Amino acid sequence: MSALLAHATQCLDTGRPAQAILALQEALRIAPGAAAIHHDLGFLCLQAGRLPEAIAALRSALTLDPSFAQASLCLGIALQGQGDTAGALAAYREAASLQPALTAAHVCLGALLESLGEQTLAIASFRSGAASGPASVWGRLSNARALVAENRDVEAEFVLRELVSLHPANAMGHEMLAMVFANGGRFEEARACYQRAIDAAPQLAGSYYDLTRCRRITRDDEALLSRMRSALVAPGLTADARLKVHLALGKALDDLGEPAAAMQHFDDADALRSSLVRFDTAAFEARVERLIDHFTPDLIARASDGGSSDATAVLIMGLPRSGTTLVEQILSSHPQAHGGGELPFWTVRGARWEEANVNGAKPALDFATLGAEYMGQLHALARQALRVTDKMPLNILWAGLIHLALPRATLIHCRRAGIDIATSIHRTYFNPYVSFPTGGAELVAAIRAVERLTAHWREVLPANRFIEVDYEQLACAPEPAIRRLIAACGLSWDEACLRPEHNPRVIKTPSKWQARQPIHRDAIESWRRYEPWLGPLAALVP
């Protein structure tokens, strides 16, 4: 037995993980009741990307030793890699409960909760992680994650600078510091940090994706392209990580004027995302029909009977990649407005309301209380601002519910050509837990369903509360479009709104680079360069 374990260690130390796995499998035939060996086998399979084998081995370890916190943590990572969100959450929580000092469990739990829109729970988990090991690498990362989630980026930068100073080979620290820089528009510093992260961990897929989105790739970047191609075929890369590398390579090849090769990578990324999360087109279309049927003109007309009287909220909504970040950047350039970013409030409340209705509960909502709860969160972001924005794009699903709770709020619908939206979505990384497709016939159907719902909102919501901004008009003739937008929000005119690229605020959305550029027309009809390779998306071509 000891010889087999020593051989496994030697294989691992010499870069032969497959042989190490074989040695551990042989050891388990001799000692099937050894929980530690099951854990080690699961851990190696996890590193090798062999997730089903990892899950089986880790579950065996936990069956033999239910108090094995590290096995529960690794199980959570493996389950998350396979798209089992509920299983991953349970495993992370169990690991953190079994061993509160296991900081990585708190960080993984917080990161997953954050991706699901559970911001308050995520911050609490990050805070627990930071408290469990404040001087450790994971503790510092956890503290930084909490600070970023609380929009305290300056403090997060200090924590991360200290981390990479103490641990210069820590790729996650460099990657997170790069993200803080990129969110603040400090792209040169971000690029340097992403490069350090890649140097430290050449398979760090997120750094490739974010680095390529911080600048245009040129023919001088052959070394970067070579590294990305190597990372793509490296063993152990999870489906989500491989997805990011495909998108990074697609962006790079797009910049280099190779749209056919770029589109192939975008298609491959979409296929991987589809393997992680299945989009149910029929269920989404049924949801849209239920919303249309429920929010009748008579119901909307009664909005003034309840809800909050607060007019502070400006909700910017529409399909993803329709220009919502640009509109928020314009509005938040006004001295009396504050950009709140993408807030998960209505995603969570809308889903709860919908679930209750579908289950036949038909809850009687207190719209004034609902509106007051939301406004409490909004005012906490900027208590002195006359207007505070919330630019969660798919709040478009809940426009009727929002109007009933906030009848004086301004709802801004960002409208853009469907085919340009589709090709932009197809090129962009979206968290697998965002329930929206990124390609194929599913994306076409989803866009058409949202457009159908939007047409309903256009008919039933008051015209002075549901304002529409056309991306193409905004890009081609910015000043008149911006003046109309500012007036519709009840703000006095300010010239700063014409120069949103100078707005220094933190931007956390995929458009953080584009939103820092002067308003331009380059993205109009951007689909044309992919025309021969559009596939099902061609159905959206006007």
Features from the language model and the residues they span:
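Phosphate-binding active sites in nucleotide-utilizing proteins
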Residues: 307-404
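Register position in tetratricopeptide repeats
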Residues: 13-14, 47-48, 81, 115-116, ...
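PAPS-dependent sulfotransferases, especially Golgi type II membrane carbohydrate sulfotransferases
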Residues: 208-212, 225-236, 245-313, 368-382, ...
